């Protein structure tokens, strides 16, 4: 169990919001007593409270790509991370042994399509500094908690728990499972789609009882 918080759409000084981000993160520190980390950019702040499971020595977050342009804060476990790491090791230079760093490698190769490559439970916020855009996503059935909201200034806020948003967000709610939010689309997109979810694929749908 870890805790993540983030502030996006910052159009004034990010330094002014840093203290707010730290307060948001402190409220969920019980989720991750092993490490506290924060990234502050011009339009985004990402923070993380870590409970060490995989790679306790070097897996502190927010994770960053080697060039520092991709930043990730994530709570979860990626079950197929070894398989993905093997597939991507020639295209991406991994900086840690964290199972979650494969998300950065996948995003660099597939963009928002990275989410569909993941097998696991997760809630994450990823900031693409070079393109000034961000991606937020949650696992298929919502095993990992994640909440999203906004304030009167137009900032988008993210937290693993509602208490991270209380008093800062004027409107908030649960981040829908099996969806991602991409800043360039400005809307939620369902990424987890399976045939069995469609009624027309039920074999006996027309049979009368």
Locations of the language-model features?
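Cysteine-centered catalytic environments shared across enzyme families
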Residues: 1-208
């Amino acid at each position: 169990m870890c805790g993540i918080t983030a502030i996006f759409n910052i159009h004034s000084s990010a330094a002014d919001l840093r203290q707010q981000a730290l307060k948001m993160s402190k409220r969920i520190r019980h989720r991750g007593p092993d490490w506290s980390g924060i990234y502050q950019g011009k339009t985004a702040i990402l923070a993380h409270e870590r409970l060490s499971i995989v790679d306790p020595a070097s897996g502190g977050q927010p994770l960053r790509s080697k060039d520092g342009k991709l930043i990730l804060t994530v709570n979860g476990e990626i079950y197929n991370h070894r398989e993905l790491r093997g597939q991507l090791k020639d295209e991406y230079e991994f900086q840690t042994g964290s199972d979650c760093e494969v998300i950065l490698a996948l995003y660099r190769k597939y963009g928002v399509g990275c989410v569909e490559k993941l097998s696991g439970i997760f809630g994450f916020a990823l900031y693409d500094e070079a393109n000034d855009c961000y991606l937020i996503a949650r696992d298929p059935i919502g095993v990992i908690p994640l909440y999203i909201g906004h304030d009167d200034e137009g900032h988008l806020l993210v937290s693993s728990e509602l208490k991270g948003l209380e008093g800062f967000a004027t409107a908030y709610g649960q981040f829908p499972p099996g969806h991602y939010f991409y800043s360039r689309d400005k809307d939620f997109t369902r990424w987890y789609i399976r045939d069995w979810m469609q009624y027309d694929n039920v074999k006996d749908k027309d049979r009368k009882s």
